[in-house]
């Protein structure tokens, strides 16, 4: 784009690519982080094998492939458009989203199992910080002089609520994360599962009630474990391998 044409677009929207059809693919956090580490260049490839059989492979050395679950964008689905902005602030309409895709994760793949184990280890490792204090900074007691006491007012401020809201994942994706967590440990508390799945507490508890038992007494008090029907199902998958 020439400088003359670019200057004319400042404050306006370039619609040259308005008719382009664009795909919108929702990816999990670990995949997004992997792409960010790659930096510039190719981050993956889309493989169209016919019909709805579409997959995504990423990273030159990873060699992992994900199936894509597609949803056609219709007038009933609020239509979305893609915009871009260059360093000079010029806006451009890059196209319309014609297809929405969600990644279907193979929870039985070795790569995904290794990822879940590393996340589980990370969230269950307590870190402590050691700080060296200079002796000159230590408290030195002084004589108390009541005449030098100054009266001041104290205000109480309400603690700001965290704005870092966790994004709700679809139930099937959360279930995959829950089953993966219980492959590493048979009993887990809510805090660990909440950190592991990165889901809002109430949303997670609703799903846990469907597949888990919360022990209310005994040595596993306040710990979750899979219900027998899901535990046996998960074990049978491992035995087939």
UniProtKB/Swiss-Prot annotation:
Subcellular location: Nucleus
Keyword RNA-binding included in the entry's annotation: no
SUPFAM superfamilies attached to this UniProt entry: Rap30/74 interaction domains (SSF50916), Winged helix' DNA-binding domain (SSF46785)
Keyword annotations from UniProtKB, A to Z: DNA-binding, Nucleus, Transcription, Transcription regulation
GO cellular component annotations of the record: transcription factor TFIIF complex
Main location: nucleus
GO MF entries: DNA binding
InterPro entries referenced in this protein's UniProt entry, alphabetically: TFIIF_beta, TFIIF_beta_HTH, TFIIF_beta_N, TFIIF_interaction, WH-like_DNA-bd_sf, WH_DNA-bd_sf
GO BP annotations listed: transcription by RNA polymerase II; transcription initiation at RNA polymerase II promoter
Family: Belongs to the TFIIF beta subunit family.
Its job: TFIIF is a general transcription initiation factor that binds to RNA polymerase II and helps to recruit it to the initiation complex in collaboration with TFIIB.
Assembly and oligomerization: Heterodimer of an alpha and a beta subunit.
Protein name, as recorded: General transcription factor IIF subunit 2
Native organism: Dictyostelium discoideum
Gene it is expressed from: gtf2f2
